[in-house]
From Swiss-Prot:
UniProt xrefs under InterPro entries: UPF0210 (IPR007841)
UniProt-recorded name of the protein: UPF0210 protein BAD_1323
HAMAP family, alphabetized: UPF0210
Superkingdom to which the source organism belongs: Bacteria
PANTHER family membership: UPF0210 PROTEIN MJ1665 (PTHR37560:SF1), UPF0210 PROTEIN SPR0218 (PTHR37560)
Higher taxonomy: Bacteria, Bacillati, Actinomycetota, Actinomycetes, Bifidobacteriales
Binding partners and assembly: Homodimer.
Family: Belongs to the UPF0210 family.
Provenance organism: Bifidobacterium adolescentis (strain ATCC 15703 / DSM 20083 / NCTC 11814 / E194a)
């Protein structure tokens, strides 16, 4: 039974501590939309999305109103489009037509973002997957809310270096195609290793082929709540600190579980998972960086940052997993530089560098996220960054990702502004020493020895 103190506590978390449900995401399978012609595929996709998701936004708003819980985004994920369009798409331009169909359908139902313009190439690329990847600069520059991801590796299969090398050039081309908007197209693209099938967050969300016809996944967010709770832990030992984070994560996740079950009931679509992630925003007091600083760092990036983040990530999972019947997605603490006020400040004064961020990705929820880098960064350097991050994920059996923005026409110290939840970021330096001879070797990096578990 709920008591009145718990009700007041939850209300305080929402009103004063910026607790929100970051997203209700509906996953929709498009496997049955495949057809002989691209136009027919586009029509099938449009019809299925607008049928299944027609009430998603209104239901989200009704739940907000009925329970008083802010739901920031309503989103859709779909089956990786490289699979759906494989039989009908004969060129990159054909895939771009599907991107436009996704954009139109998502706008019709009123969602904020749609993810799944994706390819899974952890071992090698099919012709269709390569065409989709080559279509990304045009697709992401011509659409508004379509998000894309490419899974380039996994612990079981290794890393496909052919796709990694290609993606360095593609990221540069996306940046060029959207140069008039601080290369915003790169915000909508992420390269993954060990990508999950049920991620409700963007830009990496897609509806995996292991999923059913439709599902509701929910991502929660509460770094501000954790930050306020840590005020009570000042000067206390690690046991008290960990217990405080765990208890707070439990409360945050219960809110997400309530919203997920209610959305599932009202929409008549099965509940999938809760993603336990702490997802920051650029607003003051809604920062993962602030949480790390309250744990005891002068500023994010100081020695000890990786250890503090490892502890935070683990306690969030331990607390949250007891609050939901199904946990999945990425689940942990996000470190997106442009979306986190304290990380923006740390990057601005040189305390937080890309090398430290890479170390932090060994223990955080995902990887190098929302990092603005100089526009003259080479394609090979970007491929090298993706390869490094994929290797961390492959060897450590975790999800890792890269979402870097080489801001065309800007250099170190200048500011890139992406707007809204995406925030803003100082452009930070990247080691420009060449790795071209490495990333252009061709072939794939084999899976690690500990992947052989049969």
């Amino acid at each position: 039974m709920l008591n009145i103190m718990e009700v007041h506590e939850t209300n305080k978390m929402i009103e004063q501590e910026k607790l929100d449900v970051r997203t209700i995401t509906m996953g929709i399978s498009l496997l049955d939309c495949a057809a002989d012609s691209v136009d027919e595929v586009c029509e099938n996709i449009y019809n299925k999305i607008t049928t299944y998701a027609k009430d998603l936004v209104s239901t989200g708003r009704a739940i907000e109103r009925d329970f008083g819980i802010p739901i920031v985004n309503k989103r859709i994920t779909v089956t990786p489009i490289s699979l759906v369009g494989a039989s009908s798409c004969k060129s990159s331009e054909d895939f771009v037509k599907i991107a436009h169909a996704l954009d139109r359908a998502a706008k019709k139902v009123g969602v904020d973002l749609i993810g799944g313009y994706s390819a899974l190439v952890s071992k090698s690329m099919t012709p269709a997957e390569e065409m989709l990847i080559r279509s990304l600069p045009q697709a992401l520059s011509e659409t508004d809310i379509v998000c894309s991801s490419v899974n380039v590796g996994s612990t079981k299969t290794g890393i496909d270096m052919n796709s990694v090398e290609l993606l360095g050039h593609i990221v540069k081309d996306i940046a060029h195609a959207t140069a008039d908007n601080d290369s915003y197209g790169c915000v909508k693209f992420v390269a993954f290793c060990n990508a999950p099938d049920d991620n409700p967050f963007m830009a990496g969300g897609f509806h995996g082929v292991t999923e059913g016809d439709a599902v509701i996944n929910v991502g929660v967010s509460g770094p501000g709540v954790v930050s306020r709770a840590l005020d009570e832990a000042k000067g206390k030992d690690f046991e008290f600190l960990c217990e405080t984070i765990k208890r707070t994560a439990f409360k945050i996740t219960r809110v997400g579980q309530l919203v997920a079950q209610e959305a599932s009931r009202r929409l008549g679509i099965p509940f999938g998972i809760i993603d336990l992630s702490l997802a920051p925003t650029p607003a003051v007091g809604d920062s993962v960086g602030e949480v790390l600083e309250k744990i005891g760092l002068e500023q994010v990036g100081a020695p000890g940052t990786t250890a503090a983040l490892a502890m935070l990530n683990d306690q969030v999972k331990k607390g949250g997993i007891m609050a939901s019947s199904y946990v999945g997605g990425l689940s942990g603490a996000f470190i997106p530089v442009s979306e986190d006020k304290n990380m923006i400040d740390a990057a601005n004064n040189g305390c937080l560098k890309i090398e430290k961020l890479e170390a932090m990705t060994c223990v955080c929820s995902v990887g190098l996220d929302m990092i603005a880098i100089p526009g003259d960064t080479t394609a090979a350097t970007i491929s090298g960054i993706i390869a490094d991050e994929a290797a961390i994920g492959m060897v450590n059996q975790k999800t890792t990702a890269v979402r870097v923005i080489p801001v065309e026409g800007k250099g170190v110290g200048e500011m890139a502004n992406f707007g809204g939840l995406m925030g803003y970021a100082p452009i930070i330096p990247v080691n420009q020493t060449s790795c071209e001879a490495f990333v252009t070797r061709g072939g794939r990096i084999p899976a690690p020895i500990h992947s052989f578990k049969n």
